[in-house]
């Protein structure tokens, strides 16, 4: 079923597709394009990586952090752009094996592990901490991978004054507390597939 998901995340021409409803993608671009970010950080590589590089001409550097080796390879093969710094950083503690499980049982086991990643910082510590080791500050941060509640805090610390942090799938309750710590985030409406939440760092 993971292979089928990978196929779904590719467009009809084999290119990486943005896994967002068109309404949410329009909301994202309405925020990002006027911001004219030069340095962008994202946790969770894929269609958004390709979209940023092709549709946001102000970008000089895009740092993208991915935790899944197979998906990292797909993104690396699909995007050839000198502005991209793509990093593979796996979990500090491996997810449970799904060998021999039905698709439903495998999804349940992985979902339980992903929820643990929102509560137990040691599970994805290196993944969350990798951007800080690079010595950059960012104008835009997109949180769309694993351990999002911890990436929110880490990304906020690396954000330039006046910069923007975006969270995808913000309707999930496990992320709410981390976003509220940023001050006055806005949950965008309407949404159909994965809600966006935006917070701007005071200048």
Regions inferred by a protein language model and the residue ranges of each:
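Class I SAM-dependent methyltransferase Rossmann-like catalytic core
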Residues: 1-38, 110-123
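N-terminal targeting/anchoring "stem" of glycan-biosynthesis enzymes
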Residues: 14, 27, 32, 51-54, ...
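SAM cofactor-binding core of SAM-dependent methyltransferases
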Residues: 21-97
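N-terminal/domain-start segments enriched in small and hydrophobic, helix-friendly residues
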Residues: 28-29, 33-36, 132-141
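Generic enzyme active-site microenvironment
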Residues: 40, 64, 142, 166-167
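Generic detector of well-ordered alpha-helical packing
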Residues: 43, 67, 145, 169-170
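S-adenosyl-L-methionine
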Residues: 76-135
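C-terminal substrate-binding/active-site "lid" region of AdoMet-derived donor-dependent transferases
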Residues: 128-140, 146-203
């Amino acid at each position: 079923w993971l292979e089928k998901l990978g196929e779904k995340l590719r467009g009809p021409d084999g290119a990486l597709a943005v896994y967002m409803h068109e309404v949410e993608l329009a909301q994202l671009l309405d925020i990002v394009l006027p911001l004219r970010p030069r340095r962008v950080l994202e946790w969770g590589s894929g269609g958004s990586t390709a979209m940023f590089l092709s549709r946001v001409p102000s970008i000089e550097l895009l740092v993208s952090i991915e935790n899944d080796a197979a998906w990292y390879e797909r993104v690396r093969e699909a995007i050839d752009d000198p502005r991209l710094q793509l990093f593979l950083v796996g979990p500090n503690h491996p997810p449970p094996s799904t060998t021999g499980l039905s698709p439903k049982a495998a999804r349940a086991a992985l979902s339980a592990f992903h929820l643990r990643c929102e509560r137990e910082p040691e599970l994805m510590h290196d993944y969350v901490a990798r951007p800080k080791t690079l010595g950059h500050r960012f104008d835009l941060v997109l949180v769309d991978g694993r351990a999002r509640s911890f990436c929110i805090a880490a990304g906020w610390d690396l954000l330039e004054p006046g910069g923007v942090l975006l969270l995808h799938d913000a309707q999930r309750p496990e992320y709410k507390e981390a976003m509220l710590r940023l001050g006055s985030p806005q949950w965008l409406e309407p949404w159909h597939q994965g809600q966006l939440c935006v917070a701007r760092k005071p200048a």
